Each structure stands twice: as structure tokens, then as C-alpha cells.
Amino acid sequence: AEHPDVRPETAEFLTLLREQTERLAQMTKTLLEMSNLRQVARNERIQLAPMIEEIFTDLAPLSDKLGVTLTAEGDGIMTGSDALIYRLIFNLTENAVKYNQPGGSVRVSVTQELEKLLLRVSDTGCGIPEEYQRSIFQPFFRVDKSRSREYGGAGLGLSLVWEIADLHGGSVWVEKSSEKGTTIAVELPTQQSAKP
């Protein structure tokens, strides 16, 4: 046991306290990231396929643990903040893994058009009820509070996705969702406008 010299209920309380502290620290870090987004330079050339492969590698421990298969298709090149676009795709993919079912799958696809990219993250989870499909991009919103407690997190992941897409002149929305799964789409311009 983690706390061999204390009673089980005290040990459980200490574990919960540690989890809450970690969650609060993560929330503070994410809020600081969000408040500093506008200062981040968005002039890097980003190729998405290698970035998605890197994200899959980073998420392998979680996807392996939950038995979720990750697949990618397509590629695209855009100008923006490498760190922020990584965070956007990571958050969407991590969410799709967490809220999937055991043995499920997540597919990340990129379609490049002349002046924009369309990124889709599809999962085989239980879906997002229609009345929540806009709310999920608001800070601290959660559809399934018991699930979010199980996996931790501050309820800011999709809000950060929305902020990053908006900062790059793009948009994000729930393209489709049912009890068979959800697809979240992100449209991003390939070039950033000159305004700060």
C-alpha cells in the first residue's frame, strides 16, 4: 500500500487529496497557457502527419491500457504555432481515447484544400447528446462527470482546442455524433494573416 502506517479510510482520503491537488495544478497550468495564447508566435511551418504520429506515440500508454486502436490518414502543411497545433490535436485525440469503449478505435484524418485544412478526429465512443454539442467547448464543462473524475483533467481540454483554433483563424465543431461514435472537425487556414 502507498500509506502502510495509516488506516484505510485515511489512506483513501490522502489519495483523493493528492489527486485533487494534481488536478488543481493542471488547471492552473492550463489557465495560464490560455491567458498567454495571444503572445505565441504563429509563423512556423507545420507538417501534420509526422506530428500526428508523434502524438500517437505519446498517447500509446493510454490507448494500450484502454485497448483503443489509433489510425491516421492524410497529411497537410500549414503555418502556425507548432506547440499549439500539437496541443489541439493531442487534446482531441486524448479525449477520443478516454471517452471511447474498450477495444474501440480513434481515427485522425487530414484533408488539405487550397487555403485550408480540415482535421477530423473520430471515435467509437457512446456519443455526445445533441444538447451538449456546443457546450463541450466551454471551460469546465463535462458531459460525464463520473468519467472525468476517473481520468482526471480540469475540464479545459476542449476549451483550449477551441481557443487555439480561433487564434489561428479556424473553427471547431461536432460534425456528427451518435451512440456509435463522434467526429469532431477542425478547419484551419493554411496561412496566418498578418494581424497579431
Predicted regions and their residues:
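Short conserved segments within the C-terminal catalytic ATPase subdomain
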Residues: 62-72
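Conserved glycine-rich
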Residues: 169-170
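Acidic ATP/Mg2+-coordinating residue in the GHKL
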Residues: 123
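Short beta-strand/loop element within the Bergerat-fold HATPase_c
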Residues: 103-115
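Short alpha-helical segment of the dimerization/phosphotransfer core of two-component systems
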Residues: 16-24
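Short conserved segment of the HATPase_c
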Residues: 128-142
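Short helix-loop "hinge" at the ATP-lid/N-box region of the Bergerat-fold HATPase_c
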Residues: 96-97
